[in-house]
Amino acid sequence: MGIEGVLKEGFITTSADKLINWSKTGSLWPMTFGLACCAVEMMHAGAARYDIDRFGMLFRPSPRQSDLMIVAGTLCNKMAPALRRVYDQMAEPRWVLSMGSCANGGGYYHYSYSVVRGCDRIVPVDVYVPGCPPTAEALLYGILQLQAKIRRENTIAR
């Protein structure tokens, strides 16, 4: 059924899963957890050239108001409990995007005693964005991949 059928018939048919997942993908509110230089690229994604707002995203300062955590940068052992605490404060459904080599696996500091070798050891990660630092385009691509993953989820159990 095309748009002509919608205008003529006056209604749209879809499944509840598709409708719910569409609304989730169009209103992701990320909470920034910028730990190092990757956070600068995250700021570029929010600026006028890349305009992350066009995806319905609005950066939130509080974990209680957000459903996406973008971990950007080197995660040290002292910061790991704070990352977990912030993740636990986020409401369900929640997603985590790991941005950059340091957040993905420790990066250049992988063998340091004070660095966590990947934020996936602390919180479950949904999408990894590689690079050192990854560009704003790579972050936007990772967000698009997360939106595709959300669209494939089954919200209502069958």
Curated annotation (Swiss-Prot):
Binds 1 [4Fe-4S] cluster. The gene is nuoB. It is a peripheral membrane protein. Its EC number is 7.1.1.-. [4Fe-4S] cluster binds at C37, C38, C102, C132. The keyword NADP does not apply. Signal peptide: none annotated. Keywords: 4Fe-4S, Cell inner membrane, Cell membrane, Iron, Iron-sulfur, Membrane, Metal-binding, NAD, Quinone, Translocase, Transport, Ubiquinone. GO terms for molecular function: 4 iron, 4 sulfur cluster binding; iron ion binding; NADH dehydrogenase (ubiquinone) activity; NADH:ubiquinone reductase (non-electrogenic) activity; quinone binding. PANTHER family: NADH DEHYDROGENASE, NADH DEHYDROGENASE [UBIQUINONE] IRON-SULFUR PROTEIN 7, MITOCHONDRIAL. Its cofactor is [4Fe-4S] cluster. NDH-1 is composed of 14 different subunits. Subunits NuoB, C, D, E, F, and G constitute the peripheral sector of the complex. Gene3D superfamilies: 3.40.50.12280. SUPFAM superfamilies: HydA/Nqo6-like. One of its GO terms (biological process) is aerobic respiration. It is an enzyme of class 7 (translocase). InterPro entries: NADH_UbQ_OxRdtase-like_20kDa (IPR006137), NADH_UQ_OxRdtase_20Kd_su (IPR006138). It catalyses: a quinone + NADH + 5 H(+)(in) = a quinol + NAD(+) + 4 H(+)(out). The keyword Membrane applies. It is found in: Cell inner membrane. This is NADH-quinone oxidoreductase subunit B. One of its GO terms (cellular component) is plasma membrane. Pfam families: Oxidored_q6. NDH-1 shuttles electrons from NADH, via FMN and iron-sulfur (Fe-S) centers, to quinones in the respiratory chain. Couples the redox reaction to proton translocation (for every two electrons transferred, four hydrogen ions are translocated across the cytoplasmic membrane), and thus conserves the redox energy in a proton gradient.
